[in-house]
Every structure is written in structure tokens, then in C-alpha cells.
Amino acid sequence: MRARLHLLDWLACVAGARATPVAAVARTAEPDILTRAALLGNVLEMDDVHRAALLHPGPVIWPSALSAARQEKCGMDTALDGAVRGYEAMIAVGTTFDAHHYAHFHPTSTAGGFGGVAAAASIFALDTEATGWALGNAASVTGGLWRMRHEDVMTKAMHAARAALEGLWLARLARAGLTGPVQALEGEQGLYAAMVEHPKAMELGPDWLIHAVSFKPWAACRHAHAAIDCAIELQAAGKLNLPVAVETYADAIRFCDRPHPVTELDAKFSIQHAVAVIADGRKAGPEDFTAQAIAALADKRAQVSVREAEEFTRVYPAHFGARVISGTAEMTLADTRGDPERPASPEMLGAKLRSLVQWGGLKPVEADRAHEIALHGTSIGPLLALLEDWLA
């Protein structure tokens, strides 16, 4: 059931992004419906996230798994099993990366190919040797620079799609006999030597790592979510009054200290804007990060200050915490809604699905259709038909 919930969440993200400029590019450039979907899962910044690995598995794993399942004409259970293995590989590799890597590279991209390979390899029933070849080749071609954060471009969406499609392709090549370097992570001139200063040990616990993945209820960068959650809690208690101060961990400030956002992407990566959204009585949905919202919230945004608190930096990335201080009132959260410690309820995921279906310009019945297929479907045929209807 856990994998089905993440499939549902990915479908919600795709639905919400179907009217975006990236979707227009996808329809023009890509005839394949799953390739179009692969470009959309990350667009709204509402895709699932693993905190310690600092990456978003969903937009990579589902296009790879579903494409492999379509090719093999297999059932939903086989696709779900492959997806769980894809989450496992992507997260396991991602958790070995260090702060140096994250400072320069986008882990959803750099670790994503491993997940795409593992998902497809499972569905293709590759043996250990062939799977190792494909994983090694994923390491040999990986990349994904953060430069796109500094320009108003669509590259981030392409990163996730590339990892998904590349993983599928490499698994297909390995099945045909294409060999690859099995020491591509730790070997001489391997990934770690090129991109990581201090690799961490790969830790695989007793439970599948998909259970440690967080859902994102709000349409902003995950680094802004703890501040949003604190603001919501203060607002519910009638204690959120501007001006406010936000204390959080260093990376949240590095990525999301943007007091003067200009573009929609800027706003999604602005703690100041995210907290102003809540102070204005809004819900932090996609509509709250548009150009219109940026202009409307300028005065409130100017009353939100941001600073680092070492107590949050010390426990990051295991926990993405924050504190919002409003006069004599304050709210501190070590974790945020959607994290395993503050798990997403079925109601929250259902509300997210309905909201994004509406935002994407679909009829409400499409939310019911997606819900039924994702949570109860036994074949991927209806899922492919759903995406065809949404993205044609």
C-alpha cells in the first residue's frame, strides 16, 4: 500500500503540472505519454522527498517503472515491486553523498539514474550481473548541476526525466549484454572521486527505504516547509502576527533566503514568501506562488526575516526543522507534515490530489479515477489510459 500512495502522489503532481509551460514543451517534443509525464512530476515542487538523501524519488521512479511494465506487459504488482526497489537504490546511493556534493549537484539527478535502473531491472528480471552493469553505467553518465537554480529555466524538470529515461535505457541495454563498471562508485576515477569529498557508508536498514520518504503538502521547496508548518500552527492558535522571524538550518537559508522573488520558481524557493502566504490566510497551493501572488504579498513578505539556528543545522538532514517567532509567541517543529514523524493522513493526500486535479484544469471526477487506479488497480492499462487523457 505504501508504494500505491506514492504512485497516487506522483499522479497528483503530474495532474497539477499539465497546464504549465513545461507541459507544452512535453506535448510538442515527446510523442510518448510516459516521457511527457516524466517531465511533469517535479514541476510544482510538490513531489515526494527523502530528507537524508536530499532527493525526490517519485518523479524519477514512476516513469521508469511504468515504462518497463508497459514494455513487459506486466501487472500492477510487478510495477509496484519494481518501484519499491527503485526507491531503495536511489535513496541508498543518495545518502552516501556529502555536503560538498549537494553544494554543486542536484541529487535527484545524480542519484536518480540508479533508481531508474533498479526499477526497470527488477521488472525486466535482470540477474545480479546485468543489474550491476546497468548501475555502473548509471554512475558513469550521471550529472546535474545546480546552476539552473540561478536562472528562470526548466532544467530541473528535465533532470528528473533524464534520470528516469536513462535508467530505463541502461537496464534495457544491460539485458542485451552491454557491460558496465561495477566499481563505478568507489573505484579509481569513479563517481565518489569526481563528485564527493567524504562519501558516507551506505546504510540499508530492516525496512524498505520508501517508508522513510516524506510527502509534500505545499507547493514550495521542501526547505521552506517547516517554516510553513510553524506558521500554520501559530495561525490556528490566533498568534501569527507580522512581523515574524524564522529560524532554521543553514541549507534552508542557502537555498530559500529570497526576500525579493521575481519568478514563480523564486517564490517557491523563498521562505519569506512562503510564510507571507500563510500570514495572508492562503493555503500555500500552486496559485500562491504565481506572479500575481508575488506582487500581492510584497508588503507582508518584507515583514518576514530569516536566520540560521545551530540547533536545526546540527540535526539536518535527518530533520528539516524550523521556528517561527511572532511577538511573544513562537512555534518550533523538528519535523513537518508529511514526514514519517508527522505522517500524511489519507485525507491530506486526497485533498492534495483534488486540489492539483483542479489546478491542472481537469474535472473533479479525474481525482476519483486516479484514486481508484492508484490504490486498487491490478493492471497498468487504465493508468496509461488516464495519462493519455490528461496529457494528449
List where the protein language model places each region:
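Well-ordered alpha-helical segments within folded domains of soluble proteins
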Residues: 59-66, 112-119, 164-168, 226
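Terminal-appendage/accessory-domain detector
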Residues: 1-54, 155-165, 172-392
